[in-house]
């Protein structure tokens, strides 16, 4: 039976019921709905609606119900209840009789669903924080294991300057740390309870909403009943954090997809995260990474859909807001899966140090070092830049790397170039000069690795 049937003399059309009902997806809020109901029953005792004995019976019944749905949440879906709130209430009435009908006193589904959703977001957020940390740990471990590997750095997908594999991996550790911080911020902002706000104007019972909030694990209660039932900022914020983090993961995936190509050959993916072709027996496709890249659009699209659902929506609850859950659930599930899959990819990733070194030494990646050498000889950088550009054109024509040009060839472009130029063009010298904080010098990368290992261990411990 619908919770609102008394007003109606005609039953709902079956097509409308199917269109309107949300149990098929909001059943995922069962644990949170029961948790909130347990706290609400205690609050009703304090205002004289329930006796302590009645609350005890409800508590016992809800504990049994909670254990049941934790063991088999799919059981909920065989019901024809409109939503998870209706299902929980019906289950309680079946367990304790008319006493179950008293539980909804002073409460609306509007503040109830807002509370359930926030409780779910808090729990899911903690899982996501753990998955971000696990991926960061995987990146740091991979960086440590391949610390010696030199990697060509790219701009515009053209070889630019040499970096190291460890420096590359640590770049994603930094991106993920910002994601971690943004998620923490979003979780902090949503950590207020709307329960007790009623449909929109507040409850008619003198509920201690602060105590109620603390009982459910919130930091406090919301301040305005109308805002509380209208608010879905936390949904949008979490979807935004997911979208941005997925964008970072898509860049990580694209880098490794490119590094894994036959043309690059910098890394080899494990058989465990790749698949083959039904036609071409030689193929080993980076499906895990391609799916991470592809699923980014799915998560970003969910955020855009939620924003459009909220656009120009009048205050208080409107049925449009039922559209918040499917997109949120899917976005956070997808983000969680992709974080875990990225960590799995790293476990058995092999770095081909010989190929990365050869690539880093090619493409005139030491041209900037020659320009810096000329600056040290007193030539203004802009002029030095022009001289080196002409030198590179010549080197390409004669098919030589810069370090193999003779002094005579160098001096065709600048008479200040002497034999001391050659040590400056060596790859390790190129790395060693990047000693400023955040640079690619070996000691800087080691310091960054130690720092990341330290704070990740502290967080995990």
UniProtKB/Swiss-Prot annotation:
What domain of life? Bacteria
Q: Name one Pfam family in it.
A: ASL_C2
KW Amino-acid biosynthesis (keyword) present: yes
Its pathway, per UniProt, is:
Amino-acid biosynthesis; L-arginine biosynthesis; L-arginine from L-ornithine and carbamoyl phosphate: step 3/3
SUPFAM superfamilies noted in UniProt: L-aspartase-like
The subcellular localization recorded is: Cytoplasm
Catalysed conversion reaction? 2-(N(omega)-L-arginino)succinate = fumarate + L-arginine
A GO biological process of this protein is:
arginine biosynthetic process via ornithine
User: What is the E.C. number?
Assistant: 4.3.2.1
Recorded GO MF terms: argininosuccinate lyase activity
Q: Which keywords does this chain's UniProt record carry?
A: Amino-acid biosynthesis, Arginine biosynthesis, Cytoplasm, Lyase
Keyword Isomerase among record annotations: no
* GO cellular component assignments: cytosol
Q: What class of enzyme is it?
A: lyase
Which NCBIfam families does this one have? argH, PRK12308.1
Q: Describe the family membership recorded for this protein in Swiss-Prot or TrEMBL.
A: Belongs to the lyase 1 family. Argininosuccinate lyase subfamily.
UniProt protein name: Argininosuccinate lyase
Record organism: Aeromonas hydrophila subsp. hydrophila (strain ATCC 7966 / DSM 30187 / BCRC 13018 / CCUG 14551 / JCM 1027 / KCTC 2358 / NCIMB 9240 / NCTC 8049)
């Amino acid at each position: 039976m619908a919770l609102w049937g008394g007003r109606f003399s005609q039953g709902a059309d079956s097509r409308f019921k199917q269109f309107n009902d949300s149990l098929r997806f909001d059943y995922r809020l069962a644990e949170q709905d029961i948790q909130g109901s347990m706290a609400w029953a205690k609050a009703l005792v304090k205002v004289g609606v329930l006796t302590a004995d009645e609350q005890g019976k409800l508590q016992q019944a809800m504990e049994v119900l909670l254990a049941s749905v934790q063991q088999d949440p799919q059981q909920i879906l065989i019901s024809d209840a409109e939503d998870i709130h209706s299902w929980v209430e019906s289950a309680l009435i079946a367990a304790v009789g008319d006493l179950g009908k008293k539980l909804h006193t002073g409460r609306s589904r509007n503040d109830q669903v807002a509370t359930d959703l926030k409780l779910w977001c808090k729990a899911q957020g903690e899982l996501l924080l753990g998955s971000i940390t696990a991926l960061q740990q995987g990146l740091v471990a991979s960086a440590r294991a391949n610390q010696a590997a030199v990697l060509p750095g790219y701009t515009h997908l053209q070889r630019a300057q040499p970096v190291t594999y460890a420096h590359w991996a640590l770049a994603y550790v930094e991106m993920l740390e910002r994601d971690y911080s943004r998620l923490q911020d979003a979780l902090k902002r949503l950590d207020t309870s709307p329960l007790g706000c009623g449909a929109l104007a507040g409850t008619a019972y003198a509920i201690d909403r602060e105590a109620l909030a603390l009982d459910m694990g919130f930091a406090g209660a919301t301040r305005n009943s109308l805002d509380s039932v209208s608010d879905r900022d936390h949904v949008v914020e979490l979807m935004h954090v997911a979208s941005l983090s997925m964008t970072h993961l898509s860049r990580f995936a694209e880098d490794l997809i490119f590094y894994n190509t036959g043309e690059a050959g910098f890394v080899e993916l494990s058989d465990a995260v790749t698949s083959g072709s039904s036609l071409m027996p030689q193929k080993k496709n980076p499906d895990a990474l391609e799916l991470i890249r592809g699923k980014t659009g799915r998560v970003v699209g969910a955020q855009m859909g939620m924003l459009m659902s909220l656009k120009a929506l009048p205050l208080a609850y409107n049925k449009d807001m039922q559209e918040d859950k499917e997109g949120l659930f899917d976005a956070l599930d997808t983000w969680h899966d992709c974080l875990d899959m990225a960590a799995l990819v790293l476990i058995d990733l092999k770095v081909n140090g010989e190929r990365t070194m050869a690539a880093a030494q090619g493409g005139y990646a030491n041209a900037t070092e020659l320009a810096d050498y000329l600056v040290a000889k007193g030539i203004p950088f802009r002029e030095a830049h022009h001289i080196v550009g002409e030198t590179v054109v010549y080197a390409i024509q004669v098919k030589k790397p810069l370090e193999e040009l003779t002094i005579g060839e160098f001096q065709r472009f600048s008479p200040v170039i002497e034999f001391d130029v050659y040590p400056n063009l060596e790859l390790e010298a190129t790395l060693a000069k990047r000693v400023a904080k955040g640079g690619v010098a070996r000691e800087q990368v080691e310091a960054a690795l130690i720092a990341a290992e330290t704070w990740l261990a502290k967080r995990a411990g």
